[in-house]
């Protein structure tokens, strides 16, 4: 990297940091963190374990916001020192290499911080629950479902999020009939809510002996994981429970007793299941949490549809409304039909490179709320 290029890059970073600083009341944030930490030192703090954990989680969110900003400022200050050293000795390859690597890392961190500023919905900070449901199309569709399962797992791992498989049903020949995963990490739902909808896949099918092109569809549902502080009324009479033998991905660790639980909410037809816990009671409890999350999400969607009807916005739902297409033949492209963002690197996307699509979606959502 040329020194002049590094100077321009650092100058742009400084402008971004000043913009971030203008939206962050550091003094108020520091006082809020101190208040939380004072509460954590009180003798009766652990009397209510659930409440104590919530205080700790909220404090960690604030500390993460503060530390992320301070980390950016420290990185840019270090880059300024490296530029001074490089100017004094332009032939020092070690300094130039450190400068180039530092600029790349700082830019990546600034992009990530900027992305977080777009997360403004009430439950964006929560963990995310993703349900993957292949459409009709046999083995090709179930294999596409497995590809999406892998894509989201890769994306989560790249962001140091934890992934837990809550429910997994393998396809007859390949892939999955359905899967539910939980992504645990700060802002997981805020990032992944962009993935809710129908994903279209076009390729020459490896399962077709004639080598023909196939189009497959998979529906992805995304909801925030809700805690008990969110009240969602569910009548016992409205819920039907079925039990089954649970097993892991690919048929691993199949239980000899029926510990898996499937709940059907009869008024809405919503079905959820859980196999993640070791006991039937544990799976019923977790499945009920999933059901409440889905009912809450359904209520939000109703309100959004009502709002859209009043403002004249067009709402698209169902299998006919693909949000994104992944084309491997006759050309290579991934395109989001909401934002029009596209790339000609489908394999990178399938390997978890979703951030550009997430960023474009969040920017698009912001433009809908603030047209001017």
From Swiss-Prot:
Keywords: Cytoplasm, Methylation, Protein biosynthesis. SMART domains: PCRF (SM00937). One of its GO terms (cellular component) is cytoplasm. The modification N5-methylglutamine is found at residue 252. SUPFAM superfamilies: Release factor. Methylated by PrmC. Methylation increases the termination efficiency of RF2. The keyword Protein biosynthesis applies. It is found in: Cytoplasm. One of its GO terms (molecular function) is translation release factor activity, codon specific. It comes from the Bacteria. The keyword Disulfide bond does not apply. Peptide chain release factor 2 directs the termination of translation in response to the peptide chain termination codons UGA and UAA. Belongs to the prokaryotic/mitochondrial release factor family. PANTHER family: CLASS I PEPTIDE CHAIN RELEASE FACTOR, PEPTIDE CHAIN RELEASE FACTOR 2. This is Peptide chain release factor 2. It comes from Leuconostoc mesenteroides subsp. mesenteroides (strain ATCC 8293 / DSM 20343 / BCRC 11652 / CCM 1803 / JCM 6124 / NCDO 523 / NBRC 100496 / NCIMB 8023 / NCTC 12954 / NRRL B-1118 / 37Y).
């Amino acid at each position: 990297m040329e020194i002049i290029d590094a100077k321009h890059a650092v100058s742009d970073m400084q402008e971004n940091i000043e913009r971030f600083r203008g939206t962050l009341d550091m003094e108020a944030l520091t006082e809020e963190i101190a208040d939380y930490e004072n509460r954590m030192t009180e003798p009766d703090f652990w009397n209510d374990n659930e409440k104590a954990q919530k205080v700790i989680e909220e404090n960690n969110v604030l500390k993460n916001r503060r530390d992320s900003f301070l980390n950016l400022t420290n990185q840019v200050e270090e880059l300024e020192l490296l530029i001074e050293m490089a100017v004094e000795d332009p032939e020092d390859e070690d300094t130039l290499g450190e400068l180039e690597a530092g600029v790349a890392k700082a830019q990546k961190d600034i992009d990530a911080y900027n992305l977080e500023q777009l997360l403004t919905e009430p439950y964006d900070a929560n963990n995310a629950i993703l349900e993957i449901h292949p459409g009709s199309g046999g083995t090709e569709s179930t294999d596409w479902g497995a590809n999406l399962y892998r894509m989201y797992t890769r994306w989560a791992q790249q962001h140091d999020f934890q992934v837990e498989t809550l429910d997994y049903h393998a396809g007859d020949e390949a892939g999955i009939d359905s899967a539910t995963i939980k992504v645990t990490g700060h802002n997981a739902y805020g990032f992944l809510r962009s993935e809710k909808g129908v994903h279209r896949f076009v390729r020459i099918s490896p399962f077709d002996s004639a080598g023909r092109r196939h189009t497959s569809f998979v529906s992805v549902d995304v909801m925030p994981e809700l805690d008990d502080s969110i009240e969602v009324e569910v009548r016992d009479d409205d819920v039907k429970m079925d039990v089954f033998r649970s097993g892991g991905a690919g048929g691993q660790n199949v239980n000899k007793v029926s510990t898996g639980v499937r709940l059907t909410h009869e008024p809405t037809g919503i079905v959820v299941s859980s196999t993640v816990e070791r006991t039937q009671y544990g799976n019923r409890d977790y499945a009920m949490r999933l059901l409440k999350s889905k009912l809450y999400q359904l209520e939000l969607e109703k309100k959004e549809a009502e709002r859209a009807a009043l403002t004249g916005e067009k709402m698209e739902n169902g299998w006919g409304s693909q949000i994104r297409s992944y084309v491997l033949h006759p050309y290579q492209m991934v395109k989001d039909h909401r934002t029009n963002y596209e790339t000609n690197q489908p394999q990178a996307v399938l390997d978890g490179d979703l951030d550009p699509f997430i960023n474009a979606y969040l920017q698009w959502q912001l433009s809908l709320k603030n047209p001017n």
